[in-house]
Amino acid sequence: MSGKPAPAHRAVLLEEAVEALAVRPDGIYLDGTFGRGGHSGRILERLGPDGRLIALDRDPEAEAEAARRFGDDERFHFERCSFEMLQQVTDRLGISGRLDGVLLDLGVSSPQLDTPERGFSFMSDGPLDMRMDPESGESAAAWLARANEDEIAWVLKEYGEERFARRIARRIVETRQEMPLERTRQLAELIAEAVPFKERHKHPATRSFQAIRIRVNDELETLPRCLEQIPALLAPGGRLAVISFHSLEDRMVKRFLRDQAEGERLPRGLPVQGDARRGQTLRLVGRAIRAGEAELDQNPRARSAVLRVAERLA
């Protein structure tokens, strides 16, 4: 029932996120981003024998970790897929509209960043891949080899908020005419050369690597498709907790939750009672939560994390 001991990797905002779900021992919960199972493990600790946890992730290494840690726990069920498939999974399992909580921990897990072969990080050299699912889709190297300068510049500016997007895109196109871009260190050095001055405490490739990863994994397209499904899948009183790691994601989550909480204003003159709104599905729970100093001392990557919580209305 308890699963195997958790690995050294610790999920960001672990206690805060699980606390926000207000886990009931007999509840049904869904972890849309299993990663290495930090949040799932804590949810299972709070579930009783009649509780259920469904976890999703498109990373084959996450699937292996799920089997290793929780494969013998009858309360746990894993599906290898993107969280945009959430409703298909819950429909098939017969739990749509019955979920007591959904957790989304967006972005890249620390083990993914720390594995050079995955190609997410410029801190060590590896193949320029960046795919959450390395068995499908187009790698970062393949995209950079075919995209034109305008497309690359747009991605760097829109997804990475990179002020030197055009300079970097031009350098990428010039360089690939002489040699293929296939390694993370190769790309990081190219970007560092293209950026005219450096920000303190931030590698010049940080924004570009983020932007390319978002493009390769279609992250800002899949997120709204996932969010739109969730209100109808929650039971009344069910909670949604979302952890985002950069401003584009957080703005998207904040806007979605606000719109669901405010609903649609009805035209003046209609005979309605109370607040003249319809379509309200969620209520906001508290303010946005950020990591405390103790967690930041242990995990500096938590600095940009923001947790937002909402609850399904009856």
UniProtKB/Swiss-Prot annotation:
One of its GO terms (molecular function) is rRNA (cytosine-N4-)-methyltransferase activity. It catalyses: cytidine(1402) in 16S rRNA + S-adenosyl-L-methionine = N(4)-methylcytidine(1402) in 16S rRNA + S-adenosyl-L-homocysteine + H(+). Its EC number is 2.1.1.199. One of its GO terms (biological process) is rRNA base methylation. It is an enzyme of class 2 (transferase). Transmembrane segments: none annotated. Gene3D superfamilies: Putative methyltransferase TM0872, insert domain (1.10.150.170), Vaccinia Virus protein VP39 (3.40.50.150). The keyword S-adenosyl-L-methionine applies. The keyword Membrane does not apply. Keywords: Cytoplasm, Methyltransferase, rRNA processing, S-adenosyl-L-methionine, Transferase. NCBIfam families: 16S rRNA (cytosine(1402)-N(4))-methyltransferase RsmH. Specifically methylates the N4 position of cytidine in position 1402 (C1402) of 16S rRNA. PANTHER family: 12S RRNA N4-METHYLCYTIDINE METHYLTRANSFERASE (PTHR11265:SF0), S-ADENOSYL-METHYLTRANSFERASE MRAW (PTHR11265). Belongs to the methyltransferase superfamily. RsmH family. This is Ribosomal RNA small subunit methyltransferase H. It comes from Thioalkalivibrio sulfidiphilus (strain HL-EbGR7).
